[in-house]
Amino acid sequence: MTTSLPKSTIHRTVLNNGIVVLVTENPSADIVATRIFVRAGSCYENRTEAGLTYLLSAVLTKGCDNLSSLEIAEQIESVGASLSADTSADYFLLSLKTVTADFAEILRLAARILRNPTFPEAEVELEKRIALQDIRSQQEQPFSIAFEQLQQMIYQKHPYAMSALGDEFTMNRLKREDLVRYHQTYFRPDNIVISIAGRVTIADTIALVEEVFGDWHSLAEPPQPILNFPINVEPQHKATYKQTQQSIVMLGYLGASVISADYAALKLLSTYLGNGLSSRLFVELREKRGLAYDVSAFYPTRLFPASFVVYMGTAPENTKIAVAGLWAEVDLLCRNQLEEDALTAAKNKILGQYALGKQTNAQIAQIYGWYEILGLGIDFDRKFQEQIMAVSTADAIAAACQYLREPYVSLVGQEDAVTTAMPFPGHGV
């Protein structure tokens, strides 16, 4: 067993079997929150199995060795605890929250679920039907349609191209045996980070985790994600005709991963453009020009290069103007149109929101476990804030010129409105 950062408020330990344990002592409330991260997620799915990790998350808690779904639920609810599974592009997550007195009992239950799920056939089929309903529902939502076609243009054969749900074809193909195989492959101690925050002591918590998980061992080398990353950035446009009351206009760019030196600059640009009522897009395109029902920007934190997206919901007759307006606002960033005061405001906003996102035990357990599973280490909490503060206007403009040159364009709306908006004169699309 190796231990590091002994003076930190976050204590990091690596068990002999490879499990990383993070413990944060926070006695202010009689609550313990735990996040168990698995190095899995959609990046570890074959294209023909898209949705597999999502289905596994839905079925994982529906049965384990000698416990049915009902018995698991009763054990959790009898002490007022919570336990749930979720998945993302870069990791799988099991979350639990209890009062301190019940922490050991619920952690032992979580270990049984994580290590020995039974994946009952009836539960697999039920969750598949629910997932298929969700997929069909997404196919009726203009925003979801626009985002999915944007991701597919940007990422091509990379797993980020697909929705976490997959599609009807891939979800229909999935079987219980696929869940068993995936679980056996990726759910292994050297692929796991356990992050715990609350009214606990470091020594007792590590001893408990060692007792519960210490006899779990891996037999082979850990598997790697399935990348197939697009080699070339080749902006294009795509439209879906749909009888809607508004058009969805979405522009996307292939940005940088969280490990890139440009990550902080792109985070600030996204905040400047689309975070809140004072953001550039909201003020210029909604308040001043009245073009937008909804307008924003987002740039998620990803292990591999993330998409940088600006979007707007607008009246059908404004579709063409909306495309030009969004495009022009992003283009301005490459033309030195970013003031020092605006960048400072974006820094204050992002750091303020970041601080507010680390108040509860659940938030603390989440953020440090997330950084660890991405390979950033818990010190990224400090580094991220330093990186944000260090970004200059020249850095931000340089990042815009490198990553935000020409967008992929995704449109959803009435045929006449969308057709009028394409092609895009003067932009070479």
What do the PLM-derived regions correspond to, one by one?
Residues 1-32:
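N- or domain-start disorder-to-order transition segments that initiate the globular core
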Residues 4-7, 78, 231-233:
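Short solvent-exposed loop/turn micro-motifs enriched in small/polar/acidic residues
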Residues 14, 25, 71-221, 228-230, ...:
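Charge-rich, well-structured scaffold segments of protease-associated domains
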Residues 25-26, 34-40, 220-279:
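His/Glu-based metal-binding/catalytic segments typifying zinc-dependent metallopeptidases
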Residues 28, 39-43, 416:
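Short active-site-proximal "capping" loops at secondary-structure junctions
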Residues 33-97, 276-291:
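M16/MPP (pitrilysin/insulinase) zinc-metallopeptidase core fold and M16-derived inactive scaffolds
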Residues 45, 49, 103, 107, ...:
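Short, charged, low-complexity patches
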